[in-house]
Structure formats: structure tokens, C-alpha cells
């Protein structure tokens, strides 16, 4: 795997509050190697370790993007949702930022059926076909379309399982992480001091509750993805 420089600075991470963990009572002992101190009842994450694993993750996604791999970003809690969507759109990645529907990956055939239905309804709306239906039928299909847009809008162009999944908040997205583990899909996961660092392929110790922290980590990762895609185009 190519090792590159990703412009990761400890000062920048401190300003974003990446180092603030959970209260010392809410912690996973497996996170001990990634914690540098306790301050006012809060665990402080070792940002040197954060920088190391973030750099490794950037190397991984750069190489994967340069080989045309597909990415899925997952972060459904309110503090992560907007950052996940904007980061994914910027890097042309798929994303889930509202609710993880159980079996979204492990029961891919069902998800694929829903996506086909979603695409058909979108096409019918664009052509005006929905408006030519009886009012009751049109209203029902529009509600269905709205529901599908909310939960599948970020993966509407997915045609198969993703090659790498990036997860914000291991605890919140545990179902998504388990599905990736079941299917053997590589994962990169933001982990706070209450998480298990051994579950993901690359775990990045970071504050997963602060918007600035989430945004900073995602920005570094999607910048690496964008660079990887650009290098692929240049090398053709």
C-alpha cells in the first residue's frame, strides 16, 4: 500500500475537539492504548495514534479509489448526517445518513428490489406519469417515493455491494458494522472511548459526537478518495 502525506496536524485536530472522549465511567477497557489522559472526568484520546490510523486509512482509500473501488459512508445520527452526505457527494460515494435498514447489505437482493422500485418511481415522476394517475394512486406512490428517497436516496446508484465501508460512530451503526463483518467487507470506523477498536479493519480513535471532529476526519478521508480517483484518471 502506498504511503503518502495527508496534511494531518495535531493542532487542527485539537481545535476540532477530536481528542475529547466520553466520561471515564463510559469507556471500553480495550480503548486503553488509545487514551492518553483523564481530564475533568473525561478520557482524552491520544491524537498521535489518531493521526497514525487516519493516515493509514487515507492510504487505504487512496489506493482503493485509484483502482476504481466503490465506497459507502454510514452515519445516521443527527450530528453526523449532514457531514456524511456532503462528504459522500463531494467524493462521489454512496451513503446512508437517515436510518440503516437491517439487511441492507446482507440481504442485498431485497435492497436491490427496493432500488429498482425507487428508480422506476423517480422515472415516472420525471416523465409526469404519476400526475396522470388517479389522485389516490398518485398520492400513494408519491408517499412511497418520498419514503424511498429518505432511506435509499444516498445509495440510489449502487449496483452491488460496496468495496469499503466508512462508519461514523461504531455504537450507533453496530448493525451496519456487523453486516460488513458477516460479508467480509473492509471497514474504516471512527471509534470513541466507549468503542471496541478490534471490530473494524482500521479504527480511527476520535470524538464521534462533535460535528467539527466528524467533519475533519471525513474531509481527510474523502480528500484521499478524490486524489485516488484523480490519479487513476491521470494514469490511464
Swiss-Prot record:
GO terms for biological process: translation. CDD domains: RPS2. Its main location: plastid. It is found in: Plastid, Chloroplast. It holds the Pfam family Ribosomal_S2. SUPFAM superfamilies: Ribosomal protein S2. It comes from the Eukaryota. The keyword Ribosomal protein applies. GO terms for cellular component: chloroplast; mitochondrial small ribosomal subunit. Keywords: Chloroplast, Plastid, Ribonucleoprotein, Ribosomal protein. InterPro entries: Ribosomal_uS2, Ribosomal_uS2_bac/mit/plastid, Ribosomal_uS2_CS, Ribosomal_uS2_flav_dom_sf. One of its GO terms (molecular function) is structural constituent of ribosome. The keyword Zinc does not apply. NCBIfam families: rpsB_bact. Belongs to the universal ribosomal protein uS2 family. PANTHER family: 30S RIBOSOMAL PROTEIN S2 PROKARYOTIC AND ORGANELLAR, SMALL RIBOSOMAL SUBUNIT PROTEIN US2M. This is Small ribosomal subunit protein uS2c.
